[in-house]
UniProtKB/Swiss-Prot annotation:
Protein's UniProt name: Protein Wnt-3a
Family recorded in the similarity comment: Belongs to the Wnt family.
Subcellular location: Secreted, Extracellular space, Extracellular matrix; Secreted
Record keyword DNA-binding present: no
Leader sequence residues: 1-18
Record field: transmembrane: none
Gene Ontology cellular component annotations, sorted alphabetically: cell surface; early endosome membrane; endocytic vesicle membrane; endoplasmic reticulum lumen; extracellular exosome; extracellular region; extracellular space; glutamatergic synapse
Keyword Cell wall biogenesis/degradation: no
Residues with attached carbohydrate: 87, 298
Coiled coil location: none
One of the protein's GO biological processes: modulation of chemical synaptic transmission
Keywords for this protein: Developmental protein, Disulfide bond, Extracellular matrix, Glycoprotein, Lipoprotein, Secreted, Signal, Wnt signaling pathway
Modification after translation: Palmitoleoylation by PORCN is required for efficient binding to frizzled receptors. Palmitoleoylation is required for proper trafficking to cell surface, vacuolar acidification is critical to release palmitoleoylated WNT3A from WLS in secretory vesicles. Depalmitoleoylated by NOTUM, leading to inhibit Wnt signaling pathway, possibly by promoting disulfide bond formation and oligomerization.
């Protein structure tokens, strides 16, 4: 069997045996484009537990936004990790879209759960504010009285509704009394808290001749890039935990506690994990690592995106790459821009 075929087969087997959130595949599958118009497709979304299936049928008109949220979460993950050994690669020929990487309770798994949960809350909240779903809209729960010279107006985005959708849908399968479910619930909530803590006021001036006699203000979500940056910082400072078992009336329950007591206890906005990450230097179908061979590296950087670290000490190749680009652009009155086309040579460095 070819290496890629073996890799995909192993991915499929591992997701079937584990608790992989394979419903994330709805963001890249054929269901994504038609989910809102055909409610019966809820039953065809892979990996849904009964509670998620009921939620899908009850809120089918916002399910395209759920799919969109997963999609923007994946895209943001790939942006944030573009210069890392693990660059949030997805496997589009498998329902387990990240391969076996998320089978372990690592920092990477913590980040992916957080950014996906945040993406769902973000996309649903935005969709409601845009009026694309009849069951939701703008928020009427303003925080505080208007200040001097301004009043509440516009459409405050309803992050409480978006957060509820994310919580009810994403957390539905995380109800087992084991450590991994506890970790996933915590990191899902950290993603939602990232959105809620970054809500900010936007205001618009009203008055004669452009004056600002009065302002109307509303609550708005940040750009999702700010959420990605915030959660990436949380990834870098994630709290390592240990698993503890204790007996309750329902049986044995696993909980998490910080491994190191001299560090601060993680808050609901922090990411947590309890298993070490692989180094991702070499291809390994067991861990889901694709390795870093042929990855572009930054020869002038001493960081993780630099050739020394990204290439794991194997060295790198260099080549000259010619690119045709627009150049010497001139604005003409009125109103167009004319450009010439130039060939430029760039040095490209890739890992051996």
């Amino acid at each position: 069997m070819a290496p890629l075929g073996y890799f995909l087969l192993l991915c499929s087997l591992k997701q079937a045996l584990g608790s992989y959130p394979i419903w994330w595949s709805l963001a890249v599958g054929p269901q994504y484009s038609s989910l809102g118009s055909q409610p019966i497709l809820c039953a065809s979304i892979p990996g849904l537990v009964p509670k998620q299936l009921r939620f899908c049928r009850n809120y089918v008109e916002i399910m395209p936004s759920v799919a969109e949220g997963i999609k923007i979460g994946i895209q943001e993950c790939q942006h944030q990790f573009r210069g890392r050994r693990w660059n949030c690669t997805t496997v589009h020929d498998s329902l387990a879209i990240f391969g076996p990487v998320l089978d372990k309770a690592t920092r990477e798994s913590a980040f992916v759960h957080a950014i996906a949960s945040a993406g769902v809350a973000f996309a649903v909240t935005r969709s409601c504010a845009e009026g694309t779903a009849a069951i939701c809209g703008c928020s009427s729960r303003h925080q505080g009285s208007p200040g001097k010279g301004w009043k509440w107006g516009g459409c405050s985005e309803d992050i409480e509704f978006g957060g509820m959708v994310s919580r009810e849908f994403a957390d539905a399968r995380e109800n087992r009394p084991d450590a991994r479910s506890a970790m996933n619930r915590h990191n899902n909530e950290a993603g939602r808290q990232a959105i809620a803590s970054h809500m900010h006021l936007k205001c618009k001036c009203h008055g004669l001749s452009g004056s600002c006699e009065v302002k109307t203000c509303w609550w708005s979500q940040p750009d999702f890039r700010a959420i990605g940056d915030f959660l990436k910082d949380k990834y870098d400072s994630a709290s390592e935990m240990v698993v503890e078992k204790h007996r309750e009336s329902r049986g044995w329950v696993e909980t998490l506690r910080p491994r190191y007591t001299y560090f601060k206890v993680p808050t609901e906005r922090d990411l947590v994990y309890y298993e070490a990450s692989p180094n991702f230097c070499e291809p390994n179908p067991e861990t889901g690592s694709f390795g870093t061979r042929d990855r572009t590296c930054n020869v002038s950087s001493h960081g993780i995106d630099g050739c020394d670290l990204l290439c794991c000490g194997r060295g790198h190749n260099a080549r000259a790459e010619r690119r045709r680009e627009k150049c010497r652009c001139v604005f003409h009155w009125c109103c167009y821009v004319s450009c010439q086309e130039c060939t430029r040579v760039y040095d490209v460095h890739t890992c051996k």
